[in-house]
Amino acid sequence: MGLLRIMMPPKLQLLAVLTFGVLMLFLENQIQNLEESREKLERAIARHEVREIEQRHSMDGSRQEIALDDDEDILIIYNRVPKTASTSFTNIAYDLCAKNKYHVLHINTTKNNPVMSLQDQVRFVKNVSSWREMKPGFYHGHVSFLDFTKFGVKKKPIYINVIRDPIERLVSYYYFLRFGDDYRPGLRRRKQGDKKTFDECVAAGGSDCAPEKLWLQIPFFCGHSSECWNVGSRWALDQAKYNLVNEYFLVGVTEELEDFIMLLEAALPRFFRGATELYRSGKKSHLRKTTEKKAPSKETTAKLQQSDIWKMENEFYEFALEQFQFVRAHAVREKDGELYVLAPNFFYEKIYPKSN
């Protein structure tokens, strides 16, 4: 390259640099176009598959409505928080759906926006509640909590979720935006090319690692109210806690994902029979690993922990962890380092009137 500079006149050197720059921009644009085309094709294929399923079940469009059995009239919604091992868990649901005879559907919102418009909320609630062909159904997507009773629905879905230590989640997301993961290693990420570590970002006061970026798990559980997305809102934290206890069937933590799966299998075998063994086999456990992730320094962690936002997100995480461990303590026992689900420990007696 040095010899080329000596031999080439300055004007030609400038022209070569400009040509190279234009070529790189062109290639990046082509890659982006290909990615958008792939996404459009995936959506078209998904719509085609849905139409085929509906036609298969329609019976000439005049089939009489027959009440579904309780085991069939079930909807699970997993409104997954980004970077909480959600892909690992969701792929277990995909692996089991054919064997356990249920449907899995991804809720694909534009640009992964967790807040739906009011009209989309109505369409979504009406659609999943009346879509008999997709029952029993397991829906998953990066969508904040939605209260179905607000729309006059008689039967609510079963909500589940997983959350993670707030700083660990943010660090994982920071590196994911830059280096991707081993699930789709060839995909170009939004911040690709930015080599700055998380520690360097915090030291420089960068926006991608600011304490405000911690504010995610609380609004996901709080829901679609405007105050939920007001960073640092005490009302949002209280509402998120209320929903976790009253609206969610079970909320696990990433750090104890196997126990979460075990409890789901024990309580909802219609969906999760075989899930624990599948997770333990290693085929899907920790499927998606963020590339080039570096643990933050003690100084970085201490700096983030000074933030009121971290204190609130951590309070919510500790609240969820305590609730999960309470549920687990009453459902399983440990023996020789292994957890075992408790057998049923109630029965009925003194039944009156006596049958003849």
From Swiss-Prot:
Keywords: Coiled coil, Disulfide bond, Glycoprotein, Golgi apparatus, Membrane, Signal-anchor, Transferase, Transmembrane, Transmembrane helix. Its EC number is 2.8.2.-. Residues 24-51 form a coiled coil. Adenosine 3',5'-bisphosphate binds at residues 83-88, 164, 172, 279, 285, 290, 293. It is found in: Golgi apparatus membrane. The chain crosses the membrane at residues 12-28. Its main location: Golgi. Residues 1-11 are cytoplasmic. Residues 29-356 are lumenal. Disulfide bonds join 201-209, 222-228. Glycans are attached at residues 108, 127. It comes from the Eukaryota. GO terms for molecular function: heparan sulfate 2-sulfotransferase activity. Belongs to the sulfotransferase 3 family. Catalyzes the transfer of a sulfo group from 3'-phospho-5'-adenylyl sulfate (PAPS) to the 2-OH position of iduronic acid (IdoA) or glucuronic acid (GlcA) within the heparan sulfate (HS) chain and participates in HS biosynthesis. Homotrimer. This is Heparan sulfate 2-O-sulfotransferase 1. The gene is hs2st1.
